[in-house]
Amino acid sequence: MSVSAFNRRWAAVILEALTRHGVRHICIAPGSRSTPLTLAAAENSAFIHHTHFDERGLGHLALGLAKVSKQPVAVIVTSGTAVANLYPALIEAGLTGEKLILLTADRPPELIDCGANQAIRQPGMFASHPTHSISLPRPTQDIPARWLVSTIDHALGTLHAGGVHINCPFAEPLYGEMDDTGLSWQQRLGDWWQDDKPWLREAPRLESEKQRDWFFWRQKRGVVVAGRMSAEEGKKVALWAQTLGWPLIGDVLSQTGQPLPCADLWLGNAKATSELQQTQIVVQLGSSLTGKRLLQWQASCEPEEYWIVDDIEGRLDPAHHRGRRLIANIADWLELHPAEKRQPWCVEIPRLAEQAMQAVIARRDAFGEAQLAHRISDYLPEQGQLFVGNSLVVRLIDALSQLPAGYPVYSNRGASGIDGLLSTAAGVQRASGKPTLAIVGDLSALYDLNALALLRQVSAPLVLIVVNNNGGQIFSLLPTPKNERERFYLMPQNVHFEHAAAMFELKYHRPQNWQELETALVDAWRTPTTTVIEMVVNDTDGAQTLQQLLAQVSHL
């Protein structure tokens, strides 16, 4: 009996089972213990293969692929700390709803807790973060193939969002020629091998039903809060809110066109909050809100009803409102709850939104990150997409820009970490094949610098704008101790990215003004390669501009 041959047959069943649940993209890191999984993936023509040498980046690459494809994405890594590097991407997927399937190779049980090399306690290591965790036994013909495939099917068939961790121990030898070992074991699955359906099919999840009192609530004074959603959903939500005559407060990830722009500015005005006190019902569609003033208003508002509609399960309401948590696809929910044409009930807020935008426009000429945030809609590629980093940059875009309705916007706003942003952007571009504009800060770029290797392989133009404000300037917006702020919070690194781009043979520009930036962008959109544009700005101007605008708009 060949151990290596049966390892591969066991792995082949696992990988084939994944294809029955829509898995097409598979991300593979180098490793020896994962050889059975890697070879099974390589031999399966249903997969699109992606490779990367850094498991943390690989997990985020898978996250980006899943964001766009809306399908589960598989990841294969070897044993040991390679597995732990998948933790950040798994956490993010659990909070934002992407489906990741982590296939982690492991040592067999007799090599755990005895000093064996690269052997750690992998089962359960991700605690409560996976939606499902499966600890497979070592491959053996004593366990029927139908148990293995139905175990995979059960986990994936009931997976609505988040990650599945499948721990796969393999004994040595891992290498060798294939023979007939385990062939009859494998063939007992019969015509499943020629089929394209799961062995075990789970009943679909039930979504929230139509709210029978909607006809009553839609006649009230309502507010629509739009969080993260798809581009198509964003357009539908904007039309729905307009028909109802309800003000729509749109997050940067809502893709609604933000008909009342600069909400994070005008929500700091007492006239706006006073008018919003008349709200009888808030309908929040989507989660992961960005703006500080929006979150403050959300926490303090006291409508008669607060409804949250999102496809993701869980509470999704840090303010713990009295109301309804409705688990449903947003577009489907809108169909079940049609709008009734009514006149807008807010008077002050549209005026304040217009005045706030004019205040931003009046400051647009200076070459800085706040101005870039406002101008970003002018720089979006046609038929393309935007990926927004975390920390200060996403807050500036949320507060100062007005993105077009239905234009795809992606970000990692679940746990809102700055790790893996370049890798996620790479996955977003690969899955869509669209021209992509990505914008991150300098610390975010440094954190995921080796992901520039992934950006060498793009199918359409990708522009990475690195806003270099020399540190974590978001802490300038917080009451951090002044004497300790620079060393312990901002942590300026005094670096530039020209040599990093050169190392990975990427085009690089460092514009000094808007004309040079726009010229670099025109050139970048012409060829299907990656261009790094480093925008060096004054350290504190972005945060100061936001604070000045907040003060100005609060007194309108």
Curated annotation (Swiss-Prot):
UniProt pathway annotation: Quinol/quinone metabolism; 1,4-dihydroxy-2-naphthoate biosynthesis; 1,4-dihydroxy-2-naphthoate from chorismate: step 2/7; Quinol/quinone metabolism; menaquinone biosynthesis
Enzyme class at the top of the EC tree: transferase
Signal peptide: none
Reaction catalyzed: isochorismate + 2-oxoglutarate + H(+) = 5-enolpyruvoyl-6-hydroxy-2-succinyl-cyclohex-3-ene-1-carboxylate + CO2
Task performed by this protein: Catalyzes the thiamine diphosphate-dependent decarboxylation of 2-oxoglutarate and the subsequent addition of the resulting succinic semialdehyde-thiamine pyrophosphate anion to isochorismate to yield 2-succinyl-5-enolpyruvyl-6-hydroxy-3-cyclohexene-1-carboxylate (SEPHCHC).
Quaternary structure annotation from Swiss-Prot or TrEMBL: Homodimer.
Protein name stated in the entry: 2-succinyl-5-enolpyruvyl-6-hydroxy-3-cyclohexene-1-carboxylate synthase
Species per Swiss-Prot/TrEMBL record: Escherichia coli O7:K1 (strain IAI39 / ExPEC)
Lineage: Bacteria, Pseudomonadati, Pseudomonadota, Gammaproteobacteria, Enterobacterales
